[in-house]
């Protein structure tokens, strides 16, 4: 268990051996400069940023993949049913799930997503709220939860991916 900045703890599994024989990610990670250019080209005036609660743990694993995440503790053998930290392809897989399933058709238009950070923007209040509603509806349907203390809405500028 590794302590997190907020005082809670994170279970960490050493997946180095698995990662050594895992193929490189097939889904590309977003280019931050390109994301910022896309946002800027829409000339937004209102911004919001959302942080997913334990982002990776909200992405389900296939039955085949679960076996590879097995780990042993004093009371038994367990495997993850959701994406754990430490896997070589975890960032890419999570990004793919968000882009092709959860927020399909919204990324690059309504919002930008980088791992578990979602940035929404609009030229005016009405557009911003309409976009937020679209994103919230997708998150609701897909059972994606946000960390309220890390969500900020209605700002004229925000920190994103940093």
Features from the language model and the residues they span:
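Retroelement reverse transcriptase polymerase core
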Residues: 1-162
